[in-house]
């Protein structure tokens, strides 16, 4: 199965951060309107034309990106809970942006070095990859799908990425 992996557009977390919302509440943040034109342009690429379905994270930023893409194509759209973001706090409470970033950098450094992850406060790459693969296996009947999700989901599938994947960008790979 060919996968066109699209990282969601640029989110606007300003209100969520201003109100010290929990991670769950932050996931309702919409896309930043200042970047919508750029996202629309990126999603007009002909590579999407022969896909058969869109499989999407349930987070608002991914859903809004998938909706923009789907407006052009009218593909069947599947929303999958397990394509969600990496969990910075497995307990599900509020953690500061600084602490979330610290955990993210630690997570990525361990991923880069291929070292075991032992901090139980955040989700490990093996768990993230397992839940993502379980979702994708259900869509094997398709030859080509678009997955709209998050950078850490892409990295769980493709390994550590030195250059990252900018919001709204996409990569194609075979599963």
Predicted regions and their residues:
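Generic beta-sheet signal
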Residues: 3, 52, 141-151
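Cofactor-binding loop segments of dinucleotide-utilizing enzymes, especially the Rossmann-like FAD-
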Residues: 8, 82, 150
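Active-site-proximal alpha-helix that buttresses catalytic centers in soluble enzyme cores
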Residues: 2-77
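A short, acidic, amphipathic alpha-helical segment used as a generic capping/interface helix at domain edges
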Residues: 127-141
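Phosphate-handling substructures
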Residues: 15-33, 72-130
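Acidic, low-complexity terminal tails and accessory targeting/binding regions
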Residues: 1-3, 19, 37-47, 78, ...
